[in-house]
A protein has these predicted regions:
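ATP-binding glycine-rich loop module of kinase domains
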Residues: 20-49, 72
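Active-site acidic catalytic loop and adjacent metal/ATP-binding pocket
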Residues: 24-27, 142-188
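Helix-rich C-terminal or lid/interface subdomains of diverse kinases
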Residues: 192-195, 209-278
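Hydrophobic residues embedded in beta-strands of well-ordered beta-sheets
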Residues: 34, 69, 170-172
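Conserved kinase catalytic-core helix
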Residues: 46-63, 77-118, 133-153, 161
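Active-site Asp-x-Gly
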Residues: 168-215
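Juxta-kinase regulatory segment immediately upstream of eukaryotic protein kinase catalytic domains
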Residues: 1-16
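Conserved short submotifs of the Hanks-type protein kinase catalytic core
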Residues: 68-76
Length: 278
């Protein structure tokens, strides 16, 4: 497969990044600079496949139904969560994206449906039966129902590894649109960004705990995200309630995609820790 990629693209060097349902290849020129991204579905290949170039333009953001997709690389590097200027650029990109794609209200009916569907799915996971996920989701529903939201387009996986920053012109490019929704919950992308800031490290539970206590590496980024969300949504948001919701959604995703037991149980423990915070 490596020879096939080299022959089809003309690039001899690349970096692989594994995702749930695909493998991404970042193609490098002779100087080692990224030039293109290939998204290759996890499937059988007979090496007659064509590489389909794509240019994303709203609302057609999702991946086309082809095995191999090619996009130009529009960044210097992935977002650095410890660089507050990078975080601000990502937040500016997200608020502009939501302002430009907002539509009708994300009302109490939408929130009720979202929460009840999540409860029903989580009921299948034995490892959390003794944890108060129903109670935490009811708290989430009560909390966000009091806030006026508009539906917006949702990237669906707006986290550090999918955000590229161009240092030359201080612009942002976002990759991996496989979970894109044209209309959805505007909180999802903010919480994905926050989670990817504070759940990192060899011990994600302790990393999260230290960031929430105000002693972790990502505290400046977390403060900026909180401030931006409160101003953008014109509300006093309870971040613990929102993070519980985020962790439960990741836990369900990992359960469905049969992720490694280490990754899976990390989120069980993250939710356990968050559920114990008053």
């Amino acid at each position: 497969f490596e020879d096939f990629i080299k022959e089809k693209t003309g690039f001899d060097h690349y970096i692989q990044a594994s995702r749930n349902n695909k493998v991404m290849h970042i193609l490098l020129d002779e100087s080692g600079d990224p030039k293109k991204i290939l998204s290759c579905k996890r499937a059988k290949y007979d090496f007659t496949e064509k590489i389909m170039p794509i240019i994303r333009k709203f609302p057609k953001m999702k991946d086309a139904n082809e095995k191999i997709l090619s996009e130009d690389w529009f960044g210097n590097d992935h977002l650095d969560r410890l660089n507050i200027n990078h975080v601000k650029l990502a937040l500016d990109w997200l608020t502009n994206f939501q302002n430009n794609t907002s539509s009708g209200s994300f009302d109490s009916h939408d929130i009720e449906e979202e929460v009840e569907n999540l409860k029903s799915e989580l009921d299948r996971i034995e490892e959390i039966h003794n944890l108060p996920y129903h109670k935490c989701l009811d708290e989430y529903k009560q909390h966000v129902s009091a806030i006026k939201f508009k539906k917006t387009a949702v990237h669906g996986d707006f986290q550090v590894r999918n955000i590229l920053v161009n240092q030359d012109n201080l612009s942002v490019n976002v990759i991996d649109w496989s979970a894109f929704m044209e209309k959805g919950n505007p909180l999802i992308d903010f919480l994905a960004l926050a989670g990817s800031m504070i759940f990192q490290g060899s011990d994600s539970v302790e990393e999260c705990r230290s960031n929430l206590r105000g002693t972790g590496k990502a505290v400046p980024a977390l403060k900026l995200i909180k401030k931006t969300m409160n101003e953008y949504f014109q509300a006093d948001l309870d971040f613990i309630i929102l993070l519980r919701f985020r962790v439960l959604k990741i836990l369900l995703r990992n359960f469905k995609t049969k992720r490694t037991s280490t990754d899976y149980f990390t989120y069980v423990e993250l939710f356990r820790m968050l559920s114990e915070i008053n």
